[in-house]
């Protein structure tokens, strides 16, 4: 995993699968969405195989691994089931995330500092099979430093607090928290990605932060695609972040 010279867009297709699973049909196909996203300029495709299988299924992951022209960023919880699955399919990129059954979406970052031995073991186990691991964490120096200690080459900073901020003061504070996290991560020698809750009206400020390698965005893209189509939604987002990062 190397730092890109330009900002990258990772497209999360989980919620295409959410729509499919709502009726238990074969459509819409997240694999087709992934291929359309690639054609529209996505630099990678992100999928989260959750313990409860609420959206992405094993079959989706296997198909994507075979057909993607870019790369798959496989999000997973730190469980024996997921580690064994990863060892079987060997995705090039894995992002370890926290996970609870009751949450609507990932609610916070992984507590690396509070479980260093467990996370280090997972990172080492995945590295042995050639997987490059990132850790989804809050923009907190303690968690960033712990991520470095456990051997992860990359982190993804949770931008949910920024996305949820209501007042201009709160927005500015949370944006600065992300910017400080990026700077600290880079100083630790880590590749720094970011994502969660980003959409067409708040993404530019984050994309403008110097040093961010990649933004992972999903729900907003799928929602916008209902009105403009998936390729157009991805192309619009890609144009926004590239322009903001200049």
Swiss-Prot record:
InterPro entries: Aldolase_TIM, PyrdxlP_synth_PdxJ, Pyridoxine-5'_phos_synth
Enzyme type, top EC level: transferase
Binding positions for 3-amino-2-oxopropyl phosphate per the UniProt entry: 12, 23, 197, 218-219
Pathway membership, UniProt: Cofactor biosynthesis; pyridoxine 5'-phosphate biosynthesis; pyridoxine 5'-phosphate from D-erythrose 4-phosphate: step 5/5
NCBIfam families per UniProt: pdxJ, PRK05265.1-1, PRK05265.1-3, PRK05265.1-5
Any coiled-coil regions, as ranges: none
Residues flagged as site, Transition state stabilizer: 156
Family: Belongs to the PNP synthase family.
Protein name, per record: Pyridoxine 5'-phosphate synthase
Taxonomic classification: Bacteria, Pseudomonadati, Pseudomonadota, Gammaproteobacteria, Pseudomonadales
Subunit structure: Homooctamer; tetramer of dimers.
Keywords tagged on the record: Cytoplasm, Pyridoxine biosynthesis, Transferase
Top-level taxon of the source organism: Bacteria
GO molecular function, one term: pyridoxine 5'-phosphate synthase activity
Biological-process GO terms, alphabetical: pyridoxine biosynthetic process
Annotated function: Catalyzes the complicated ring closure reaction between the two acyclic compounds 1-deoxy-D-xylulose-5-phosphate (DXP) and 3-amino-2-oxopropyl phosphate (1-amino-acetone-3-phosphate or AAP) to form pyridoxine 5'-phosphate (PNP) and inorganic phosphate.
A GO-annotated cellular component: cytosol
Binding positions for 1-deoxy-D-xylulose 5-phosphate per the UniProt entry: 14-15, 50, 55, 105
Pfam families given in the database record: PdxJ
Localization terms from the record: Cytoplasm
Active-site residues per Swiss-Prot or TrEMBL entry: 48, 75, 196
EC numbers for this chain: 2.6.99.2
Reaction(s) catalysed (UniProt annotation): 3-amino-2-oxopropyl phosphate + 1-deoxy-D-xylulose 5-phosphate = pyridoxine 5'-phosphate + phosphate + 2 H2O + H(+)
Principal location: cytoplasm
